[in-house]
Amino acid sequence: MFKRMVLVALLGVFSSVSLSAKSLLRDDGILVSDLKGMKSELSDAPAWVFEDAKVPYEEMGVAYIPVNNKYLGIEQATLNAKLSLIVVFHEIMMKYKKRFMEQFHESEQTATNISYAIYNYLATKIQVAYTYTNLKSEVAVVKIKLVGCQIEQIKRYLKASVENLNDNEIAYIAKVAQKEFGSVCALR
């Protein structure tokens, strides 16, 4: 009973804080595709802000800067970029999920757990490469990329994270990971 009361109180505090903070944030969003149309406003921006990603598994994120705090803008832009990259990872995993389930007679839950384990591993390998802020336009731009990914680490991470995977299943997943992430993930 006491835990429930504490939980309700915390939920109320978080709700009121988020509702009061919402008025500080802009309702209109900004997209990476909007940056090319903002060249005059962002005239001091480095060239990478307006370029498309040249390297696989490199994403950009953009956000408005709330309450003149560039660090909050950078944080939000980084989260937006990470979400974009996770969507890319998810699309790759969905492409192989059904085939994996049929070939190894595994449940959908096991396939989902594998996906989550790989997302978690890859999320630890995402680094911010560049940041740019413009306080006048209230815009923060971040470029992130996948760095230090290793297929052997993915295999170890899977063994530790997903129960009952045998060596053949892990080898198959490693082969798929090498095929999809080979340009940015080393074998060792």
Where are these regions (language model features)?
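Short amphipathic alpha-helical "recognition" segments used for binding
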Residues: L7-V8, L79
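Bacterial N-terminal signal peptides that target proteins for export
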Residues: M1-V6
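Bacterial N-terminal signal peptides
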Residues: V8-S16
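Domain-level marker for long, solvent-exposed, non-transmembrane regions
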Residues: S20-R188
